[in-house]
Amino acid sequence: MPSLKSLKTRVSSIKSISKITRAMQMVASAKLRRAESRLAAARPYAKRMAQVMSLLAARAAGTPNALPLLNGRGKDQTHLLIVTSSDAGLCGGFNSNIYRQARDRALALEAAGKTVQFYVIGIKNAPVIRNNFPGKTIHETKREETSPVTFENAQKIAQDLIQRFNAGEFDVAHLFFSHYHSVLSQVPTETQIIPAAPEGDDTKNQAAANDASSGAIEFEPDEETILSTLLPRSIAVAIYQAMLENATSEQGSRMSAMENSTRNAGEMISKLSIQYNRLRQAAITTELVEIISGAEAL
């Protein structure tokens, strides 16, 4: 049975931790509002970029001079899994959820006889990937490469990926991140960014291609020239969008985790306080009994 002193020490420690988690919850709440604003501003551009690329891809796909970034190199043996994560912890299951989805995809690809490599954006998922897939990580970003989240940082990562693709290091690249819906809902998401995957419904893509072919849509200059400029940018936009989604999901997950921690701390303090008061009452009762027994003996 714990002593009064140990219970008092535990209550004091939990109260201190509760103050920290409450402060972290407030900080995460403030950061979340800013992240939501940035994400809301970026989503329409990313969506429109995907629509433009879908249209251009539908028109140019299959042509003899189609770019490798658009149609690939005719093989899909080596798959690069770009796994994002946070640079800080204490954000619930945010990082582990992304890792699990990437892990499941990696195991499925290996079972199909494919070669899997990892490109890790963010610090927290790097160690677990190294431990579970030793020797398969080709790059791990440093904190200064991803913080703060800017389009310039996303462009640098995109340029590195394109150089590695052109050098033949991989054939297909999949991007894993957490799509933000709300404070209570962040969904691990996978998207193929190299070569460019068709967006949306195939029927709509074909209709767009037919419109473009029939002259309903005119391109100046030609589609291939536009693609050579927009394809690298679309990869950077996809990475930037994933980083923004991750940053917002991270703060939402951290806010929720710290709120739960603060509530659990309050419940623990209540239980320990009751236990402390009962022990103290029992000790006082014992002392009174001893005093009365001693008085009667006299």
UniProtKB/Swiss-Prot annotation:
GO-annotated molecular function: ATP binding; proton-transporting ATP synthase activity, rotational mechanism
Claim: Membrane is one of the keywords in the record: yes
HAMAP family hit by this protein: ATP_synth_gamma_bact
InterPro entries referenced in this protein's UniProt entry, alphabetically: ATP_synth_F1_ATPase_gsu, ATP_synth_F1_gsu, ATP_synth_F1_gsu_CS
Topology class, membrane: Peripheral membrane protein
Species, as recorded: Zymomonas mobilis subsp. mobilis (strain ATCC 31821 / ZM4 / CP4)
Coiled-coil spans in chain: none
Function description: Produces ATP from ADP in the presence of a proton gradient across the membrane. The gamma chain is believed to be important in regulating ATPase activity and the flow of protons through the CF(0) complex.
Single biological process term from Gene Ontology: proton motive force-driven plasma membrane ATP synthesis
The family this protein is said to belong to: Belongs to the ATPase gamma chain family.
Keywords linked to the UniProt accession: ATP synthesis, Cell inner membrane, Cell membrane, CF(1), Hydrogen ion transport, Ion transport, Membrane, Transport
Name this polypeptide is given: ATP synthase gamma chain
Gene, per the UniProt record: atpG
